[in-house]
Amino acid sequence: MTHAIADSRVPALLDFLSSSPTPWHATASMAQRLEQAGYRRLSETSSWQLAPGERAYVTRNDSSLIAFQLPKGDTSLSSLRMIGAHTDSPCLRLKPNPAQASQGWLTLGVETYGGVLLSTWFDRDLGLAGRVQVRHADGRRETLLLTVMRPFACVPSLAIHLDRDVNSGRAINAQTQMSAVVMQLGEEAGTPAEAFNTLLIELIEEQHGVRVADVVDFELGLYDLQPAAQSGLKGELITSARLDNLLSCFVGLEALLEADGSQGALFVTTDHEEVGSASACGAQGPFLADVLKRINHYVGLDSEEGYQCLVQRSLMISCDNAHAVHPNFADKHDAGHGPKLN
């Protein structure tokens, strides 16, 4: 007999999934959790002073994070147990100049980020989230997180009587068929770009309670407002957007926080996995190596050879998900080697 997932951490997982619509939100949430647990924030642009038993974390681009706990005692660090995950998920990102006018409506052009399952984005209540850089009246610039947690836009389907072949495997063109519909344009709205800029400023001011002179730049995307849930008749399943790979982020962070400090432990989450990881804050970038070298400098064998020894003696588990056998598509897996749910 199957039963509901009884782990007491499920509510925290559901909250993390629902409140982390972008890599920047996920990283901010994990950083807050670490600080609540007593971890010290480090800066890559400042000198570090590390000692045995240290618990600290550092971020890069506000979308990648490394947290570590050094072993207690006076012995030098010889190895680390590491877990790696990624903060990004496939989604629809706004184009740099997204505003368009179509048949009297303000629509926003989108670009696919990662391997997006396009059909699932139609006819949903979509919020808007990401980060924006604003300029204040005094000329000061500031980067802020933006989270619009109400139906901001939708990508409407075409009525079936205008597209009788829609259920016959029609290809979806994200460039021409998936612009997000936001609002009707009145004569007072100005150009589409002006209307969107005004709307964006209003949303920022509403959330942060500040006066904004202008929006300098943004990295924004749409997200499904349906919250994460424990589902199935007996509660056996967790359904949510961004399970790939925020589930692994949550599990990795929990594992680090539960470490007893007897051995070195490290947790790394990187951005841009869905688009190849080839960035300064991606897994192919130098972020992890940079941090390991600095750790080795203070509590390891402070040499290139010592760093190589640390790497070779350590173990990393790379965590990802969304690979389990689908009950309706079991033929997509090797019958003897399909990963099972639960």
Where are these regions (language model features)?
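N-terminal hydrophobic/helix-forming segments and targeting peptides
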Residues: M1-N342
